[in-house]
């Protein structure tokens, strides 16, 4: 029976109900984490608008330990007086009424990123709780909200000499149900961008969960941004092309530098808001660059001999550019402002590019010559690659209609249901072929190390047999003229390599290929890394597969603590003592794992000694700090067995009038310094470490002995006791460490790595594209010195090195 469709079925969503009902319209995707982080950006953008108006110099963003986020600025502060129409405070209007704000009349803000008056009210609507504090008129105001509704009117809670706004919000987990944790890297990327775009603002970011903290204050504006993006690349034009001017109320700022890479990297911003999908400013930029450079090449006769046709792609190969426009009333395709659609922008940018770039090329003839040479060379390589493809197609060696012979394809035709495993080596490929589900799992074995595409020209890439097989198997092509995501044959591309150094290298080469040649596959979430087990543990007829060292450590501790007996001279309750010891071991392991994931990670020996070393309370007394660190270093030098020399020093922190100790490790040619800063010494982690030491000291006073089977061990150190227990436990176990996938038979490979019900896979994502770009340049690029420095800096953190 069909329900009657009449006026009773028409629902009116009032106030913020519409936001809660359809949050994606206002904030973006609430499942993939982008909408969650957009909440922070909406508030930060308001602070930036205050800066653009000349009233804000400092912004502080904090991720709190309960996963709430606070944003504080020193702007004018949200208005607190009573709104003449709504009869409530202006602050409450802004927080609870859609399309309210001070950016509609262009009087309070000439330029702003906020346009629709929905940003902060949307954040409030999608928050379980929100706290608002305003510093204004020498008064401190406060108001709290629950699910978008005020719990009480705005009230004065004290006096103040500062101005600004503080907002702390707790996202509603009824709205954000999938990805609920704020990612430091995503926030860091955006705040770094804002610092480059607004070089007069100091921006702080702190994560109380991990003690990560950064300050962003880049002088040099977008020219400094270009240098940051081109880090570890060879610049083609040493003098960055830069101009800033205003035309038809459009303020345009552009910086460009070409480099020796093969990828273009253009970032677009409107009123400081990024447009990941570009828009009319990007269209105008591309048209202006292509037209101007072709005109200059023709006028100066650079291309007389070869008459090579120059395309837009050729002019932009290796180009890094920042386009930043400021416009009074920009038009975007949606509330998330991912694409600019203001039609008047395109022609203005195109004409300004033409005027300023011609002037730059004439005033910088050496830079101009190198730029044009690169462009012509790119065009020649493109033509050579096209001819090579045509020849190979005629020969049948690159027939994109024919799948590579080594591919064992699946029966499924729907890409959403299909998987392809890129397997290291023919041996593992054979096992994978036998163990797979033929219905939807394809196998492509890759022989040896593929080309490093970071420093390989395109014509060489398409002639590489392994890469050609991979490109053909995927079906979507990598050439810009032929690339089509609709032709992709698999939506699950799984990299499966050995757990050794060679496997890690091959995995990195494949990730470099996808990042540089098929970045959209990573953005769409199609690329995965298989997690084959590192260990097989066998006791009698029982077998268990363990995926990594951390899990192996947990498993060993769990088994080691079983069937133990603890005795002491007082003959106290054995079960009670065992529980105490198990808690100490559990806390010890928890601290080690937590510290390794923390920015304040110290080497194991330092961490262990901090447990037994007295807690450092008084950082204001230089002698106390000096004595404390010297005694710690003395212990470290006595206990170290790895030829490491430990030295200490203390440094005065002028801001807080305290003394902070540090430890320097010297091993062979490597020197690493670990600072024990006030943030760490007052952190939860340091309290846990020293508290564990105090617990163990009391436990140790009773002279406890541990029995495992027929053996007895005196408990005098947590780490050594645990190692002894694990060693004794291993006697009844057979532990196999898999170095290669080929060591597994087909059934084992299926059960551990390929069965969707039991396998573990890592989805490849990019939280911070700029940092990812710099990392690929460092590790896979031509420059040796940055790579050497990176290795030296991280050498002491390396684990599981094959020797």
UniProtKB/Swiss-Prot annotation:
Cofactor details (free text): Binds two Mg(2+) per subunit. The magnesium ions form salt bridges with both the protein and the DNA. Can also accept other divalent metal cations, such as Mn(2+) or Ca(2+).
EC number: 5.6.2.2
Gene Ontology terms for molecular function: ATP binding; DNA binding; DNA topoisomerase type II (double strand cut, ATP-hydrolyzing) activity; metal ion binding
Record's keyword annotation contains Nucleotide-binding: yes
Superkingdom of source: Bacteria
Cross-referenced PROSITE patterns: TOPOISOMERASE_II (PS00177), TOPRIM (PS50880)
Pfam families: DNA_gyraseB (PF00204), DNA_gyraseB_C (PF00986), GyrB_hook (PF21249), GyrB_insert (PF18053), HATPase_c (PF02518), Toprim (PF01751)
Alphabetical UniProt keywords: ATP-binding, Cytoplasm, DNA-binding, Isomerase, Magnesium, Metal-binding, Nucleotide-binding, Topoisomerase
Site feature (Interaction with DNA) residues: 449, 452
Gene3D superfamilies, per the entry: 3.10.20.690, 3.30.230.10, 3.40.50.670, Histidine kinase-like ATPase, C-terminal domain (3.30.565.10)
Root EC class: isomerase
GO terms (BP aspect): DNA topological change; DNA-templated DNA replication
Domain Toprim, chain residue ranges per copy: 418-533
CDD domains xref list: HATPase_GyrB-like, TopoII_Trans_DNA_gyrase
One GO term describing the cellular component: chromosome
Compartment(s) of residence: Cytoplasm
Cofactor(s) recorded in Swiss-Prot or TrEMBL: Mg(2+); Mn(2+); Ca(2+)
HAMAP family membership: GyrB
NCBIfam families according to UniProt: gyrB, PRK05644.1, PRK14939.1
Family label: Belongs to the type II topoisomerase GyrB family.
Protein name: DNA gyrase subunit B
Organism: Buchnera aphidicola subsp. Schizaphis graminum (strain Sg)
Gene responsible for this protein: gyrB
């Amino acid at each position: 029976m069909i329900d009657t469709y009449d006026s009773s079925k028409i629902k009116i969503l009032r106030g913020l109900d519409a936001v809660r009902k359809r949050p994606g319209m206002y904030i973006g995707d609430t499942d993939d984490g982008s909408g969650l982080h957009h909440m922070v950006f909406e508030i930060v953008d308001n602070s930036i608008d205050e800066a653009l108006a000349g009233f804000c110099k400092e912004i502080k963003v904090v991720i709190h330990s309960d996963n709430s986020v606070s944003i504080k600025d020193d702007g004018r502060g949200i208005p607190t007086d009573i709104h003449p129409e709504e009869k409530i405070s202006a602050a409450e209007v802004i927080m609870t009424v859609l399309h309210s704000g001070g950016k509609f009349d262009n009087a309070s803000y000439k330029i702003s990123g906020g346009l629709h008056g929905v940003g902060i009210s949307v954040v409030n609507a999608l928050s379980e709780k929100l706290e608002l504090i305003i510093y204004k008129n020498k008064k401190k105001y406060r108001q709290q909200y629950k699910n978008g509704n005020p719990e009480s009117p705005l009230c004065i809670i004290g006096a103040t000499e500062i101005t600004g706004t503080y907002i702390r919000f707790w996202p509603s987990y009824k709205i954000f149900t999938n990805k609920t944790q704020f990612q430091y890297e995503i926030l860091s990327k955006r705040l770094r961008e804002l610092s480059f775009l607004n070089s007069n603002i100091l921006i702080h970011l702190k994560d109380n969960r991990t003690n990560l903290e950064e300050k962003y204050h880049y002088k040099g504006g977008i020219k400094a941004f270009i240098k940051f993006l081109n880090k570890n690349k060879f610049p083609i034009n040493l003098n960055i092309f830069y101009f800033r001017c205003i035309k038809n109320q459009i303020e345009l700022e552009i910086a460009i530098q070409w480099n020796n890479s093969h990828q273009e990297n253009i970032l677009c911003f409107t009123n400081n808001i990024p447009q990941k999908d570009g828009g009319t400013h990007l269209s105008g930029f591309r048209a202006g660059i292509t037209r101007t450079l072709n005109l200059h090449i023709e006028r100066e006769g650079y291309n007389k001999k070869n008459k090579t046709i120059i395309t837009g792609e050729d002019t932009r190969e290796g180009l890094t550019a920042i386009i930043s426009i400021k416009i009074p009333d920009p038009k975007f395709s949606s509330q998330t402002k991912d694409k600019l659609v203001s039609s008047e922008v395109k022609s203005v940018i195109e004409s300004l590019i033409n005027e300023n770039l011609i002037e730059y090329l004439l005033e910088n003839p050496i830079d101009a010559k190198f730029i044009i040479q690169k462009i012509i060379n790119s065009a020649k390589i493109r033509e050579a690659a096209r001819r090579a493809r045509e020849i190979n197609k005629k020969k049948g060696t690159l027939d994109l209609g024919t799948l590579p012979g080594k591919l064992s394809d699946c029966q499924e035709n729907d890409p959403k249901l299909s998987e392809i495993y890129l397997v290291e080596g023919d041996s593992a490929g054979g096992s994978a072929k036998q163990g797979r589900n033929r219905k939807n799992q394809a196998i492509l074995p890759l022989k040896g190390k593929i080309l490093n595409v970071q420093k390989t020209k395109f014509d060489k890439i398409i002639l590489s047999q392994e890469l050609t097989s991979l490109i053909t198997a995927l079906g979507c092509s990598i050439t810009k003229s032929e690339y089509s995501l609709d032709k992709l044959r698999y939506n699950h591309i799984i990299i499966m390599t050995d757990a050794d150094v060679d496997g890690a290298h091959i995995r990195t080469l494949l990730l470099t290929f996808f990042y540089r040649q098929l970045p959209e596959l990573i953005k769409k979430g199609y690329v995965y890394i298989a997690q084959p087990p590192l260990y097989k543990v066998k006791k009698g007829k029982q077998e268990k597969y363990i995926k990594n060292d951390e899990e192996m450590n947990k498993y060993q501790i769990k088994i080691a603590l079983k069937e133990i007996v603890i005795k002491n001279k007082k003959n106290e309750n054995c079960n009670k003592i065992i529980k105490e010891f198990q808690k100490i071991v559990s806390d010890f392991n928890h601290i080690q794992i937590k510290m390794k994931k923390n920015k304040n990670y110290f080497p194991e020996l330092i961490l262990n000694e901090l447990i037994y070393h007295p807690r450092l309370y008084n950082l204001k007394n230089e002698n106390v700090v000096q004595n404390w660190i010297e005694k710690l270093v003395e212990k470290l030098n006595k206990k170290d067995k790895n030829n490491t020399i430990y030295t200490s020093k203390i440094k005065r922190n002028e801001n807080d009038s305290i003394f902070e100790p540090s430890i320097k490790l010297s091993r062979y040619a490597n020197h690493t310094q670990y600072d024990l800063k006030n943030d760490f010494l007052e952190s939860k982690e340091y309290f846990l470490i020293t508290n564990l030491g105090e617990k163990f000291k009391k436990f140790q006073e009773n002279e406890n002995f541990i029995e495992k089977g027929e053996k007895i061990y005196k408990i005098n150190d947590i780490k050594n006791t645990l190692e002894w227990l694990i060693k004794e436990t291993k006697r009844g176990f057979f532990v196999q460490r898999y170095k290669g996938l080929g060591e597994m038979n087909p059934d084992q490979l299926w059960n551990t790595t390929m069965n969707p019900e039991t396998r573990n896979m890592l989805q490849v994502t990019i939280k911070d594209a700029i940092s990812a770009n710099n990392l690929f340049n460092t590790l896979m690029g031509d420059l040796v010195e940055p790579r050497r420095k990176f290795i030296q800096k991280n050498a002491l953190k390396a684990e599981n090195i094959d020797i």
